[in-house]
Amino acid sequence: MKRRAFLAAAAAGAALPLARPAIGGTAKTLVFVPQANLTSLDPVWTTATVTRNFSLMVYETLYGRDQAFNPKPLMVQGHTIDDDGKRWTMKLREGLVFHDGTPVLARDCVASLQRWLKRDAVSVTINARVDAIETPDDKTLVWRLKKPFPLLAHFLSKVQPQPVIVPERLAATDPFKQLTEIVGCGPFRFLPDELVSGHHAAFAKFDKYVSRQEPASYMSGGHKVLLDRVEWRIIPDGATATNALVSGEVDWLELPSPDVIPVLKKASGVNTGLLDIYGTVAILRPNSSIAPTNNVMLRKAMMAAVDPREAMIAAMGEDESGWHAPMGYFLPGVAAANDAGMAFRTKPWSVDE
């Protein structure tokens, strides 16, 4: 492959799911260096980012979030809401097939969601509102609610932990134990015989994958599979990974260290860019349960004393295209972003405050 790229994560944004690779031209195989070793293959069992990214290759969810973080139908055709908001009826799309050749059925979805709810904190909210999830036929899920719950689709489009759909026989696995067989209905099949922990993982195009017809928008819409094969090379050493990219041994470096980015920008044949516009959040979190940082006045003083721009320069370098500071509680660029609580950056607190 002639085209090589890397993903530089912004240091001031939440860790959100990455867009699936879509390399055009005649490329058939993509060699990708993930940010960490792939130690777990179960996105319900762990919230590790590398496992989440792995799951985007092989699994799908009933709903996916678009670029504005709105839930959109993914595995389902859509839903209807009646009984004064207390009954949601969801219909699965036609043609959905698992990697083992079996059709995706409503009971697979219910079993998968029940396993997910035993691990995700949102279960407290959902279970308090759900009377039952029924499957009147193989393609239909009916949620009977105790009271209206407009955020149901939003919760089902979560990206971490992901409510991925697996066959009922696998969904019966104890949620506190990892899945040992990887079978989804996503665009790529995982190739377990090629897994070498700490070194290599591989995926093959799933020929029976049925993409949606809408334009892709982040985790929603139609994701076209333009590759026959994807290989993950685990290269923990940053310098080694950089050399592999420059020499053409690999095609995509997900998370290069900031100090090598200037080198990559000058390297022949290497394309650099910021694909994850939200990135990861850098946080200084004092322990508020013990002295002296259980004193809110001290924590406010610490907050005022730390200049986030200086911190980001120290961590990421002076090129501000790769980070954002200061930031409020929500991610820069999202609808909820605001400056609440940030006034002290422009107007210092008084002693009384």
Residue ranges of predicted features:
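N-terminal export signals
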Residues: A5-I23
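N-terminal lobe/hinge region of extracytoplasmic solute-binding protein
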Residues: V33-D83, Q114, V183
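A bilobed periplasmic-binding-protein/Venus flytrap-type ligand-binding module shared by bacterial periplasmic
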Residues: D66, A204-D207, I277-A301, A305, ...
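Aromatic- and charge-enriched surface segment that lines or borders ligand/interaction sites
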Residues: Q77-V122, P136, V142-R144, A241-A244, ...
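Surface-exposed binding/hinge segments that line
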Residues: K91, T125-V196
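Ligand-site clamp/hinge motif
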Residues: R93, S211-V263
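Ligand-binding "clamshell"
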Residues: N127-A128, P262-L274
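Structural transition elements
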Residues: G322-E353
